[in-house]
Amino acid sequence: MALKYSFKARLWHYPEEAGWYFLTLPEDLAAEIREDTAPFRRGFGSVKVTATVSGQSWSTSLFPDSKSSSYLLPVKKAIRVAAGIGVGDQVHVRLGVSEAD
């Protein structure tokens, strides 16, 4: 069975020269995902997902973030460019998690 979620968040940049770009999941959604995926989470608590933003889909992982008590979704450059999004933009995201992964 595939688990499906959606949320809105602002894109932000990790402050380093070659820093990553992330979306932080809302805490309540992170708690739901944490509970739903407990039996099949990967190393360091990461969760394999398929993410979709503005019609652009990619496979990645959610990474737990103790600072925000949530998960971080990395957004690679190709997706940011194709979706036309930048730092500070409010982004609607759909996530799919397969229990078989």
Describe each PLM feature range.
Residues L25, P74-V75:
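A conserved hydrophobic position in a structured secondary element of the catalytic/binding core
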Residues R80-G88:
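Short active-site loop/helix that positions an aromatic residue
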Residues T37, K76-V81:
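Short alpha-helix capping/helix-loop boundary micro-motifs
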Residues M1-S69, V87-Q90, R94-G96, A100-D101:
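Long, compositionally biased stretches
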